[in-house]
Amino acid sequence: MPGNTFVPMAIVDADAIVLNSPSKSFNTAGLQTANIICSDPAMRRRIDRAININEVCDVNPFGPVALIAAYNESEQWLDELNGYLWGNYTALCDFVAQHLLKWEVMPLEGTYLAWVDVSLCCDNVAVYCEQLIQEAKVWLNPGTMYGPQSGEGYLRINLACPRSRLLEALQRIANIKA
């Protein structure tokens, strides 16, 4: 996202073992494809043994091709997607600033999931999220799903959707009493 730079862990620590996947960035979760980057040959052999012991790493035949195409040939598409997601984030921030004054949107660093502090409008975010489901027909996740202490007072909004759908959901939320 603008103002943030991705720093690969392998640059920070050459001995790091990096596990990643194109599934979120390139919407390829159905291919169940990921990769492991490990520079130490002995450790790599141990990893290979461990993941093959129960045959848990059967490769989908389309997965490696999709992974290579995603990482090598999709930079323009990813840049455009990130631009759209950033537009959704700014639309969220603008809407909140005008209509949901007790919400505070946290800075977005590198994801399509917005973290929103709603502690000023409710005492119990899980109850508030249930109210949003019942009255606004909008399903948001309470922050405590992602950490009982660190998530307290927050909810999470998925920005990977059409902007019209995001704005419609926000308008429905603004129309109910908190």
Question: How does the language model describe each region?
Answer:
Residues 1-28:
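Active-site pre-lysine segment of PLP-dependent enzymes
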Residues 10-11, 34-40:
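Short beta-strand-to-turn element immediately C-terminal to the catalytic PLP-Schiff-base lysine
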Residues 41-42, 61-80, 95-100, 118-120:
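Amphipathic alpha-helix from the class-I
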Residues 45-52, 70-93, 125:
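Structural signature of PLP-dependent enzymes
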Residues 131-139, 146-178:
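PLP-dependent enzyme catalytic core of the Aspartate aminotransferase-like
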